[in-house]
C-alpha cells in the first residue's frame, strides 16, 4: 500500500534522474535553505540526481521559519510524531524508478536529528547528518552508510552531540560510518561537500 506524503517540498531534477537526494532543513529555516548545498553536491556526479527539499510542517511560535517540532522547550513526544510522518513521506518517495536504496537523505541541525531518527529505520543509500544531535532514546536500526559532520566552534549544537551519535552507531556495530569535524561554527563546511560527493560516487 502506498504511503501518504505529509510534507510540502521543492523539487529540482530531470525526467531521466536515476537517484535522489532529500534535504531536511534546520530549525527556523525553510525548504529553500539547503538547495544551494544540494546543487553543489550533485554537480557533475556520474549519476543524474533529483533534489527534493522537504518543508518542515510547523511554523515557529514567532512565525519566522519552520520547525520539525518545538524546541524551546523541546517537545520529544511531538518529535516522535514528526519522525513517524517523515518515515511515511520517505516511503512515498520509494518508487520503482528511484528506490530508497538509490537515495541520499541529508539533514542539518534539527533536520539532521530527524534524518538520523527516520532514515536509519529505512533502506537508504546514505544518511548525512550535519551539525546534528540524537533524539532521546534514539537507537539506530537499519545499517546503511552514515556520514557525520560538525563544527568545532558550534555554539548552537555542541560537537559532543555528533560524537554521541558516532558512539551509538559504533555500539550498534555500524560498518560504514564517517565522522568529520571542521574548524567552523553552526554551518556545513564547504570541504564536507567534497566528502559527500566522494562518498556518493563510492556507494552508487
Regions found by a protein language model. Give the residues of each.
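Gly/Ala-rich beta-loop-alpha elbow adjacent to hydrolase catalytic centers
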Residues: 106-111, 115
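A conserved short beta-strand
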Residues: 123-134
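Active-site signature of alpha/beta-hydrolase-fold catalytic machinery across serine-
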Residues: 36, 117-121
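C-terminal catalytic histidine-bearing segment of alpha/beta-hydrolase fold enzymes
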Residues: 163-166, 172-204
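Serine-hydrolase catalytic machinery in alpha/beta-hydrolase-like enzymes
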Residues: 2-98
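Alpha/beta-hydrolase fold nucleophile elbow
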Residues: 97-107
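Short beta-strand/loop motif that positions the catalytic acidic residue
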Residues: 148-150, 154
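Short alpha-helix in the alpha/beta-hydrolase fold that links the catalytic acid
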Residues: 36-39, 158-168
Amino acid at each position: 500500500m502506498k504511503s501518504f506524503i505529509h510534507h510540502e517540498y521543492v523539487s529540482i531534477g530531470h525526467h531521466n534522474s536515476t537517484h535522489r537526494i532529500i534535504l531536511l532543513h534546520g530549525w527556523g529555516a525553510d525548504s529553500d535553505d539547503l538547495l544551494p548545498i544540494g546543487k553543489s553536491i550533485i554537480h557533475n556526479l556520474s549519476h543524474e540526481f533529483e533534489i527534493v527539499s522537504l518543508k518542515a510542517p510547523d511554523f515557529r511560535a514567532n512565525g519566522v521559519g519552520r520547525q520539525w517540532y518545538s524546541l524551546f522547550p523541546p517537545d520529544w513526544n511531538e518529535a516522535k510524531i514528526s519522525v513517524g510522518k517523515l518515515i511515511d513521506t520517505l516511503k512515498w518517495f520509494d518508487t520503482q524508478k528511484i528506490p530508497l536504496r538509490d537515495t541520499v537523505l541529508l539533514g542539518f541541525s534539527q533536520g539532521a536529528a530527524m534524518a538520523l531518527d527516520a532514515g536509519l529505520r529505512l533502506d537508504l543509500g546514505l544518511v548525512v547528518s550535519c551539525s546534528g544531535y540524537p533524539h532521546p532514546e534514539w537507537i539506530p536500526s537499519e545499517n546503511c552508510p552514515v556520514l557525520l559532520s560538525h563544527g568545532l566552534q558550534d555554539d548552537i549544537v555542541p560537537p559532543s552531540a555528533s560524537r554521541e551519535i558516532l558512539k551509538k552507531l559504533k555500539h550498534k556495530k555500524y560498518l560504514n560510518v564517517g565522522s568529520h569535524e571542521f574548524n567552523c561554527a553552526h554551518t556545513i563546511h564547504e570541504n564536507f561537500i567534497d566528502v559527500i560527493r566522494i562518498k556518493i560516487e563510492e556507494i552508487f
